[in-house]
């Protein structure tokens, strides 16, 4: 997918739209940190697109105030069925629950962590699959890089009682706390580093991140995962698959791999 070329810039989301009466064109809107240099980004992205044999007709930039930015991408985020009969609903969207499905409501000022991304869905699927054989009253589920707390809320829906989320970003930790509270879920949310700020262990660990933090964190995660526990990792894109595999194979046994679009999600256990 074209949008995967921009992932390291577009922390705040990418919108892909068709161009009216021009079926061979698509319009991509990327929301990047305004502190970044536009000319550098433009040059870098044009080079990436050229290398991928994708032609560019024009590149424009605008500085948006916060309210305009929020409205720009929020209108595109729709309720999604992340698991059978479990709906993730953005707080700003309506949902006609005619089939009486369970609803988790997520409020967020970032587009990632609203349930629409392939990696979130595949993590949720593996979480459901591997938690079914566990004692849900005893198991601890640790979500590394918890973001909005969405996977913790899915874990709570599945019946897991002891939930811990950790994120290095204060705004993310605060957002996770708010979403847990709004959905009446009890969870410990830590703002800090895995190695120094989480002193316990867990039978089930989630890490929906990207390749760079996974390379650093995989050895640390091994110390936090109990024997016979399950680690679910995602955020591994096709282009960096070969790069991460030595880090996985060094100390982990691959139980299962799921692929959604260009993204890979793994269920692992310690060797």
Give the role of each language-model region.
Residues 1-98:
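N-terminal auxiliary segments of SAM/dcSAM-dependent transferases
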Residues 7, 124, 153-156, 218, ...:
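A structural alpha-helix within SAM-dependent methyltransferase catalytic domains
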Residues 26, 138-139, 229:
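Nucleotide donor/acceptor-binding cores
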Residues 54-58, 84, 161, 184-187, ...:
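A short helix-to-beta-strand connector/capping loop
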Residues 67-135:
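SAM-dependent Rossmann-like transferase core, predominantly class I methyltransferases
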Residues 110, 114-198:
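Conserved SAM/SAH cofactor-binding pocket of Class I
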Residues 125, 129, 168-271:
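S-adenosylmethionine
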